[in-house]
Amino acid sequence: MHVIVATDGSKQSLDAAKRLKSFADPSKITAISVVAVIRPLAAVAFADDLSGGQKTPADRDTSGFRAAAESAMATIAKEFDGWGPKVHQRLRSGSPANEIIKTARQLDAGLVVVAAGGRGISETVLMGSTAQRVQHYAPCPVLVVRPKPRKKKS
């Protein structure tokens, strides 16, 4: 089975990859494709929660988006080092939900893993909208990993 693990560069997407590892049998997975999607003419930069690097003005252009996406994919791919299945990194451009779904179809994926509530223009209004669209239209089962509950202030 080919598994797609989508990342938007958020810590939630890393948590989703770790969740897959926590229950899946690596001998049943033939390959993992880590997919990042950059949006053309994006108003919001690709998340960079995983690299820990400092942002510079140059990082805000499209090459910065690409570098952040590649860094996020590398971080997720590293999570699967030595686990078993071969890992591929696939950078796409377009609508995140559409590109994730298209990749799942092209690769005949058996599972798509996405985080709910990653990054977006408004995290409160669009919380999980990519995950919802992927869940609704993907050609295979979808594992949606919700963020850890926030601690309530006393």
Model-flagged regions — what are they?
Residues 1-55:
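Small/aliphatic-rich secondary-structure junction motif
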Residues 16, 44-47, 101-102, 124-126, ...:
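Short, well-ordered secondary-structure micro-motifs
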Residues 22, 105-106, 136:
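Solvent-exposed polar/charged
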Residues 33-35, 88-92, 143:
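General small-molecule cofactor/ligand-binding pocket signal
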Residues 36, 115-117, 146-147:
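Short secondary-structure boundary segments
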Residues 54-71:
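A short acidic, glycine-rich active-site loop
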Residues 77-112, 150-154:
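Structural beta-alpha unit
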Residues 111-137, 151-154:
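Glycine-rich, Arg-bearing micro-motifs that act as flexible, cationic patches
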